[in-house]
Amino acid sequence: MKHGFIKVAAATPRVTVADCKANGEEILKAIHEMEKEHVKLMVFPEFCITGYTCHDLFLQRCLLDSAWDELLHIADETKETDALIFVGLPLRHRGKLYNVAAALNHGRIVGFVPKTHIPNYNEFYEQRQFAGAEEEDVEFVDFLKGVINEEDEFWDEIPFGTELIFECEEFPEFTVAAELCEDLWVPAPPSIRHAINGAHIIVNISASDEMVGKDSYRRTLVSGQSARLICGYIYASAGEGESTQDLVFGGQNMIAENGSMLAESRRFENGIIYSEIDVQRLADERRRMSTYPAVSICSHTRVGFSVAEEETRLTRKYPQYPFVPSVKEERDERCEEILNIQAMGLKKRMEHIHSRSAVVGLSGGLDSTLALLVMARAFDRMGMPRDQIHCVTMPCFGTTDRTYQNACKLSRCLGAKLTEVNIKEAVNVHFRDIGHDPDIHDVTYENSQARERTQILMDTANKEGGVLVGTGDLSELALGWATYNGDHMSMYGVNASVPKTLVRHLVRYYADTCGDEELKEVLLDILDTPVSPELLPPKDGKIAQKTEDLVGPYELHDFYLYYMLRAGFTPDKIYRLACLTFDGIYDKETILKWLKTFYRRFFAQQFKRSCLPDGPKVGSVALSPRGDLRMPSDASARIWQDVLEKIEI
């Protein structure tokens, strides 16, 4: 359970209707399979001990006695099983019959959760046999009186009620509550109360029959509820073996976490699905959301259970590019939306200040290319001619012919006005003014060029009555890879919350959809150009200064950035996930090296982010000091760095 990962599973064993012993054998067989995978939370379907389709046989004492006996047998056989287990059966209580989820832990029955909402419509007639639970105080009942020896170490009254939260004694954030089938389909499911009272995982033991299209509706319910409640949701449904007299059960099992489907079974095939739910992330996300209610300490009864602490082997996958959807259709839709957000942000700013034009420094690189594409879209939306977009290319010591030519071609293809200002002479004059040797290629040599360009762009914007559009992206801002008061500064930064890995896809999307072959060719060549600030002289006419050789691969830094800010993960957890995700691409030494660089630069460069220009937020991670990141410029990175130093490779 290191880093908060809980190994969980949903199982659909084959049932024999009304044969509790046979069903118990199948349940135990599945439990033993899950034990091999070190599962800590095992969930079975509704009425898995009897079968859901017993109908009026549920009124037979013989079946009820057999179900109870089999529950005790399963409990006895799982004394050594290190897990919390949920199974379903009919249970007699206070003269009524209830449909319950029984929770088992190390041979003990630790709780009974009755179904609240009993369906009696369409194909369902459960009210014929079962009573619905009342939302009332939990009872502690001597269900085992006369069944076991009172001196037995497992003797205890068993809590019965809907308001139960099962809390792990070794890991308090591992909290579980249960609801049953129909409970999820009603306007106010019990899981709402469970979640806001501290349950990080909801289990649903279900027997949901199949109809055309019902599977997608169930999937939406489960993923949506996990997102709404910021919880893990495990759904185990009845499958093959149930009576097909009138219905068919497909065994659709699902494991979801905060809106993401971690695992789903193939329908019409019994079996087990596995995944790992990150309860630390769920707890952190709830704490971050100020509108999520504080946990009440009195409305639910806490029931303790125990599992051994161990490091969970991870099988769930994390995307290498968390900012970029992996499915092309979703990616294209996301790109279109982002371009519109950027364009609308710029449009509003220009209209507000009555701007007649816009200015951008065009280098032939990715970021300035994206900024120009956004400007073209904004001008189209405003009905303004694109020749009022003033592109300025400013070659200097490090400019290569490839980037220069691409800048010229790009502005021409988009119908923007292009001005060339060679800044070599101005920078050399500046070197003489400050007494700097131009043969010393240090930070002064580089930053003087960046600040000269910004001065030209600012003054050009004033001259043209326009706004200077910034080009810096989210990844550069996170690393502080920008010259303070140089390319760091603008009048409106359209790329400020777009990470570098996403910039590439936005430009690629524009190339694929623009309908202009010449423009597409230019954009594809820009995509193929190494990322560089071009502040050092080229070698043999080619780019000598490659950003990713200096600060590290952007795909790693974007991964680090996402899981640090969006998820709040610790450095060692990010390292673990990066090693898993980039296995075979980067070795552990490389991952750790650049992770240390990331934290060092992220903290040291906050002073640049503290005075960022305005710019539109486009995703869940942003660095604006006025919005998403309120961070002091002089905070110490020591405790994060200490964690990294303790990592053993």
Model-derived features with residue positions:
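ATP/NTP-dependent adenylation/nucleotidyl-transfer catalytic domains that generate, transfer
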Residues: 172-174, 230-231, 240-243, 257, ...
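Enzyme catalytic cores with a strong preference for nitrogen-chemistry domains
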Residues: 1-359, 377-386, 418
